[in-house]
């Protein structure tokens, strides 16, 4: 009889590069491959520890001199819509939702390009072509959905969210929308709709990605009640956004070896034949 040892995920660190959120800082990421029959379990386990998915990679910020990026999620049971969020829902009541398999379309890419050119022309995704866009949408080894929002009458595509379905919630991997309708608070509407989907499905959380204190691009996330942040190795309710100011309150940056050692992997990892 031949015995084989479990093949545990291998973790790596990217080279430092300019931070897209805070000027004058450098970012670095800890990452591992997401593949094989254990992909679903690994994604669930690491998402609960602040990791995010990008295609077939799971990553988490691991910067040498900064730890401002905080993984954020909404506790669906604790969420209560504010007045402005209720107005956003009313403004977008004419939109319909359609959930599909992760398959990229020309209409999605056209909307994606308009969104980037208007909102993130200097970002890391600005040069993404149609093939790279298709890879972002379609290369997923786990349960993913493309959720489209369209005008009820004209059928025009207004917004798109690439969403992963986790054991404990929905993870909004990437969202984009019609930049000409920015006054309609479409980004807020899509998050609110995901909260509704999660509630209907009995899922306790909606994962929003990273909240970065001091970054105008990420400030909107702190406006949702029921927000939790991953800090000190555990999820905790965020009570005061000002307490996490990126300049006044730099967070601890543990050595890479210690970070990897503290990662909790799934209890049962598949073995080779």
Swiss-Prot record:
SUPFAM superfamilies (UniProt xref): Acyl-CoA N-acyltransferases (Nat) (SSF55729)
GO biological process: ubiquitin-dependent protein catabolic process via the N-end rule pathway
Glycoprotein among keywords: no
A GO MF term: leucyl-tRNA--protein transferase activity
Domain of life: Bacteria
One GO term describing the cellular component: cytoplasm
Catalytic reactions on record: N-terminal L-glutamyl-[protein] + L-leucyl-tRNA(Leu) = N-terminal L-leucyl-L-glutamyl-[protein] + tRNA(Leu) + H(+); N-terminal L-aspartyl-[protein] + L-leucyl-tRNA(Leu) = N-terminal L-leucyl-L-aspartyl-[protein] + tRNA(Leu) + H(+)
Keywords: Acyltransferase, Cytoplasm, Transferase
Record EC number: 2.3.2.29
InterPro entries per UniProt: Acyl_CoA_acyltransferase, Asp_Glu_LeuTrfase, N-end_Aminoacyl_Trfase, N-end_Aminoacyl_Trfase_C, N-end_Aminoacyl_Trfase_N
Disulfide partners: none
NCBIfam families associated with the record: PRK01305.1-1, PRK01305.1-3, PRK01305.1-4, PRK01305.2-3
Family per record: Belongs to the R-transferase family. Bpt subfamily.
Role noted for this protein: Functions in the N-end rule pathway of protein degradation where it conjugates Leu from its aminoacyl-tRNA to the N-termini of proteins containing an N-terminal aspartate or glutamate.
Designated name of the protein: Aspartate/glutamate leucyltransferase
Originating gene: bpt
């Amino acid at each position: 009889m031949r015995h084989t040892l479990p093949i545990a995920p291998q973790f790596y660190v990217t080279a430092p590069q300019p931070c897209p959120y805070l000027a004058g800082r450098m970012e670095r990421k800890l990452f591992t491959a997401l593949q094989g029959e254990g992909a679903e379990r690994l994604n669930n386990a690491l998402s609960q520890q602040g990791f995010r998915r990008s295609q077939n990679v799971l990553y988490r910020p691991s910067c040498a001199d900064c730890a401002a990026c905080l993984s954020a999620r909404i506790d669906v049971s604790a969420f209560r819509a504010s007045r402005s969020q209720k107005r956003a829902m009313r403004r977008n009541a004419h939109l319909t939702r359609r959930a599909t398999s992760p398959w990229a379309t020309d209409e999605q890419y056209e909307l994606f390009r308009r969104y980037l050119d208007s909102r993130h022309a200097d970002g890391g995704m600005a040069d993404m072509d149609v093939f790279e866009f298709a890879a972002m949408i379609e290369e997923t080894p786990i349960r993913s959905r493309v959720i489209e929002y369209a005008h009820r009458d004209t059928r025009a595509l207004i917004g798109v969210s690439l969403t992963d379905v986790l054991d404990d919630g929905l993870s909004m991997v990437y969202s984009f929308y019609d930049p000409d309708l920015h006054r309609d608070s479409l980004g807020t509407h899509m998050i609110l709709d995901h909260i509704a989907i999660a509630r209907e499905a009995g899922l306790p959380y909606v994962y929003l990605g990273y909240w970065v204190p001091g970054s105008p691009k990420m400030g909107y996330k702190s406006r949702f009640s029921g927000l939790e942040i991953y800090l000190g190795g555990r999820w905790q309710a965020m009570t005061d956004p000002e307490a996490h100011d990126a300049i006044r309150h730099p967070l601890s940056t543990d050595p890479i070896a210690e970070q990897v050692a503290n990662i909790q992997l799934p209890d049962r990892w598949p073995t080779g034949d």
